[in-house]
Regions:
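Extracytoplasmic beta-strand/coil segments of soluble accessory domains associated
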Residues: 21-40, 56, 60-99, 117
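Short acidic/polar hinge/loop motifs at secondary-structure boundaries
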Residues: 96-123
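Periplasmic-side early beta-strands and strand-to-turn transitions of outer-membrane beta-barrels
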Residues: 140, 148-149, 155-157, 169-264, ...
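Conserved C-terminal beta-signal and adjacent last beta-strands/turns
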Residues: 171-173, 221, 225-227, 232, ...
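Flexible loop and strand-edge segments within Gram-negative outer membrane beta-barrel domains
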Residues: 188-192, 218-227, 238-283, 294-326
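Outer-membrane beta-barrel signature, preferentially recognizing the C-terminal barrel domain
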Residues: 260-279, 391-398, 447, 454-508, ...
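Structural signature of Gram-negative outer-membrane beta-barrels, strongest in the C-terminal barrel
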Residues: 327-329, 337-357, 367-370, 374-379, ...
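Gram-negative outer-membrane beta-barrel transporters
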Residues: 409-415, 499-507, 526-601, 665-667
């Protein structure tokens, strides 16, 4: 079976690409050009063409998004429009990846590309539809599920850093049931960046000791399992997902200290029951979903916050922090789409979510003990679980919400979308978030969009309740808030060229920060400060020939220069990509990502980070019956690229050097399609 996906992808005109349907902006099917938001869609063809092995490999192709590697565990942080990663909502099949403590997960490593069918993205606020955390952007990863897998596939990939991946996808029908199965197993040693000096190096200089493990290499290896089963019949679908990371090395602690001890593990189990009947009655379509999720994180033997011999030998085993947390979430949502009024599509719905941080375990040998007093130097590990001094309390949170949205096509080329969502949280109160979008299709080739949206990020359990040696909680916190106004102009001057510009103004307020108030000695989480980011996003696609497509985007961010600026975000970045089907069955892709103008804080004496340019290329061959082969080079020119770290890691975080990957796939049609 010859794979014609990439050939078909390049044969589509740019007008046809703009007519691609998406649901993320209104929860109803709309074309990208008509969607009342700045919407981007990443297809499975994009993933195959670029050789992306993980979701984070392809996200840099979207204007306004920067994926930054964090020094702790080399964890990818997805940032929209100059904001912090905690302003990003990431979902898989509509289920939020957020947890009560750690954002996407303290050991999150992305999502394997082999399970992805498409990715739908909103650049801008999404709380009017999705609720919490959708302040600056929304990503919904749609996986290969029952009814969507049109061929069975096995694949292997091997490459640099001792990286090996195997995957399987299976789709079939049985007695009227559509069945889908995807399995992805991976292991890697990770790249091992050299760390000349770490956080302990500075302490050694102050104390006259020599216990730092630097200079040495940070270890970032890990293993991954991702197993997903889906069964669908008529209007019903059942999905069961299991994700696990194991043998995960964090490399550097949050304080920038080399940590060779930690071998962490996490797991995530999802069970979803979905009902969708678009023809429930003459004027009504009905959706309902029941979702359950269980998450578990453990640091294994613990984080080695300081190496053996720290503090003039008081800690012969080092400063150790063993942590484990587990939480579960149960949610229900029902909505209806009413089309009984001419030119209106009215969606209304309600939902309830219950979250339970049911397990918190922590053992420490430095800090505040279970009696509220500091532990003595050289203390053995002491259990502070179930005390006010653990990293979080075992607590629950419940959320009730209502939402209403109307899409009004009041003329042939004008459309007004108005929506609002009300969320009521059991721990901090309620919040109301509206949206407005006016779309004017001036002609078949020219579209304008004027958008407004309000969004929020709720305070985390750590900010609300956790008593630590570094900060005190505040149960009276309000959510962080944001308001965005943007103007989008999209123009297709010919069938071969598409140009778009997006201008936005993002205002953030009520930031949650740990600060020391006058008259107090402790740092306490409080709502404080405002911040504005203005930006421009430019993108263009040119079908230079039937077998050649060029695309590019350029982003400028102009944030207020105050303490709330996301210091790790570049003020400028650019992306360029070439797809060339230079012979039948042969496809060559090359993509380049430039990151520029990253400044330090005023109290950071290090020189500004250098700009960097990373270029990747992938060659793919699909002409040998059911077989497919690909070869990729990442960081083709072996650029010395670095990402921002805390000042304790003086030379910042070195990104992976040039790396090579080879891939082989075997595809056969499932019986449903023969």
């Amino acid at each position: 079976m010859r794979d014609q996906q990439l050939d078909h992808f390049l044969s589509l005109s740019l007008e046809q690409l703009m007519e691609m349907e998406t649901t993320i902006s209104t929860d109803t099917k709309q074309t990208v050009s008509q969607a009342p938001a700045a919407v981007s869609v990443i297809t499975v063809e994009d993933i195959e063409a670029t050789g992306a092995t993980n979701l984070v490999d392809i996200l840099e192709s979207v204007p306004g998004i920067h994926v930054r590697a964090n020094q702790f565990a080399f964890r990818p942080l997805i940032q929209f429009r100059g904001t912090n990663a905690n302003q990003t909502l990431l979902m898989i099949n509509g289920t939020s990846m957020r947890d009560l403590m750690w954002g996407f997960g303290i050991f999150w490593k992305g999502i394997p590309s082999s399970i992805i069918d498409r990715v739908e993205i909103i650049r801008g606020p999404g709380s009017a539809l999705f609720g919490a955390d959708a302040s600056a952007g929304v990503i919904n990863v749609i996986t290969k599920t029952a009814g969507k897998i049109n061929h069975n596939e096995m694949g292997l990939r091997s490459g640099s850093f001792n990286s090996n991946t195997g995957w399987l996808q299976y789709g079939n029908s049985w007695n009227g049931f559509d069945i889908g199965l995807t399995i992805n197993l991976a292991t890697t040693d990770g790249h091992d960046p050299f760390v000349a000096a770490d956080g302990q190096t500075q302490q050694d200089a102050a104390l006259g000791s020599m216990v730092s493990l630097a200079p040495d290499n940070a270890q970032f290896g890990w293993k991954n399992q991702d197993i997903r089963l889906s069964v669908a019949k008529d209007d019903w679908q059942l999905r069961v997902d299991y994700m696990k990371h194991s043998d995960l090395k964090v490399g550097l602690t949050g304080a920038g200290v080399l940590d060779p001890l930690t071998t962490a593990e996490d797991s995530r189990f999802n069970l979803d029951l979905l009902y969708n009947d678009p023809d429930f009655s003459n004027d009504w379509g009905i959706d309902a979903e029941l979702r359950y999720q269980d998450l578990d994180y453990t640091s294994g033997d613990g984080f080695q916050e300081r190496p053996p011999g720290a503090f003039n030998g008081d800690y012969p085993q080092g400063v150790i922090n063993q942590m484990q947390s587990a939480e579960r979430r149960l949610s229900f949502e029902a909505s209806g789409l009413f089309t009984g009024v001419d030119k209106h599509a009215l969606r209304l719905g309600l939902g309830y979510t219950w979250q339970d941080l049911y397990l918190v375990k922590q053992l420490i040998n430095m800090g505040i003990g279970p009696d509220g007093n500091p532990l003595p130097p050289g203390s053995p590990l002491v259990d502070v679980s179930n005390t006010p001094y653990a990293f979080a309390p075992e607590k629950t949170r419940s959320i009730r919400y209502l939402f209403l949205q109307d899409v009004w096509s009041f003329s042939d080329n004008w459309q007004l979308t108005a929506g609002v969502r009300y969320d009521d949280y059991s721990d901090f109160g309620d919040t109301l978030n509206p949206r407005l979008a006016l779309v004017w299709q001036v002609s078949n080739r020219f579209t304008t969009k004027l958008l407004y949206g309000r969004a929020f990020r709720p305070p985390s359990f750590q900010e609300l309740f956790a008593e630590t040696s570094f900060s005190r909680p505040n149960p009276d916190l309000d959510p962080e808030r944001s308001e965005t106004v943007e103007l989008i102009l999209s123009y297709i001057p010919s069938n071969d060229l598409n140009i778009a510009i997006n201008l936005y103004n993002l205002q953030q307020s009520d930031f949650i920060r740990a600060i020391t108030s006058p008259g107090e000695s402790d740092r306490r989480f409080q709502n404080t400060g405002n911040h504005t980011i203005q930006g421009i996003e430019l993108e263009a696609k040119w079908q230079a020939a039937k077998t050649l497509r060029l695309s590019a985007n350029y982003t400028i961010r102009n944030p207020d220069n105050n303490q709330f600026r996301a210091i790790d975000e570049p003020k400028q970045d650019a992306y360029a990509r070439v797809d060339w089907n230079f012979r039948p069955d042969w496809n060559l892709n090359m993509q380049t990502n430039w990151i520029g103008e990253r400044e330090r804080r005023s109290n950071d004496s290090r020189s500004s980070l250098d700009d960097y340019t990373l270029t990747d290329t992938t060659l793919r061959y699909t002409g040998l019956n059911a077989w497919e082969f690909a070869f990729s080079i990442r960081n083709l020119f072996d650029e010395d690229a670095r990402e921002y770290t805390a000042p304790s890691v003086t030379d910042d975080l070195i990104l992976p050097e040039r790396s090579l990957y080879a891939e082989i796939k075997y595809k056969v049609n499932s019986e449903r399609y023969e």
